[in-house]
Amino acid sequence: TSPEDVNNFINAGIDILAPSIGNVHGDYGPAGPKEGQLHYGRLEAIDKQINKRVLIALHGTNDFPAEVMQRCIRSGAVKLNVNKLLLEVGNEVLRKYAPTTPLAKLIDMQMEVIQKETERWMDICGSSGKA
């Protein structure tokens, strides 16, 4: 997605733009995206072109380290898809405790770790206390 594309998307009636800035669906690996893979300057230029007419979402952010997530937010992204980040902690509870834990207790344990991880990412992304 280029800054020049923005008006075409907005004129089509979108509410949220999910630009491609080098992000991809799928796994980046434990280190997150490679150095130089994400084009923050392009994201900033897209944000400037949008000029608050629509919001910016990013797909393919699951393996972003905290500092990458924060830089994307500073560059204009307001919605980051983090499903895998939250499911991983819940799935770890399943792997570790499912063979020996009653289902109701297992669900409670999952909910607790997912809530804590959600709160941690809300702090990282600067969204805690905003709703």
Protein language model regions, located:
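Conserved short-loop catalytic and cofactor-binding motifs
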Residues: 30-34, 60, 105-109
